[in-house]
Amino acid sequence: MHDISSLTTRTKALPPLRVGVGGPVGSGKTTLLEMVCKAMYPQFDLIAITNDIYTKEDQRLLTLSGALPPERILGVETGGCPHTAIREDASINLIAIDQMLEQFPDADIVFVESGGDNLAATFSPELSDLTLYIIDVASGEKIPRKGGPGITKSDLFIINKTDLAPYVGADLAVMEADTRRMRGDKPFVMCNLKTGDGLDQVIAFLKTEGLFRG
């Protein structure tokens, strides 16, 4: 958790939970964020920061989806490798978080969606308290066993688009077995965000491991 001394108008005892959402291009990061926000807001006070290299496309899509009120979504143009802005030099995102918390000092969760990146991407502990890493079945059955920090070290690993398995020749049982082997006891979810299948497990994880952790 983070120091809240600078949040002079915050009335809640605990600092906001910072949740990093990472994964390759097209895996479903923005859709995941949309679905989670729609399910948890306004019961929980949420803000979201999206990262794109040259545009603010994810901010636009998230806003159009109605996931949150527009003023609660901020787009960041990283202008370089996506992982740099969430790991080596997270300053652009830290500034964005501070900016949003000035407007919404009682936020329960700050979501930070990274730009699409490779399996080596990971969030700086300074930026994220919990990390969600998402891949999609259409990228290939072999992805879980390729490893990488997103797969092996994320707090929750999400395999999306399970409905596409028959069309791309992917065996979900193999993907699940490989995931268990690579992650050990760390949790993962097989889901289809298009239908909402598996979303409840993601939300339960955020509540039990983040918001309501003893």
UniProtKB/Swiss-Prot annotation:
Signal peptide: none annotated. The keyword Transferase does not apply. GO terms for molecular function: GTP binding; GTPase activity; nickel cation binding. InterPro entries: CobW/HypB/UreG_nucleotide-bd, P-loop_NTPase, UreG. Gene3D superfamilies: P-loop containing nucleotide triphosphate hydrolases (3.40.50.300). One of its GO terms (cellular component) is cytoplasm. This is Urease accessory protein UreG.
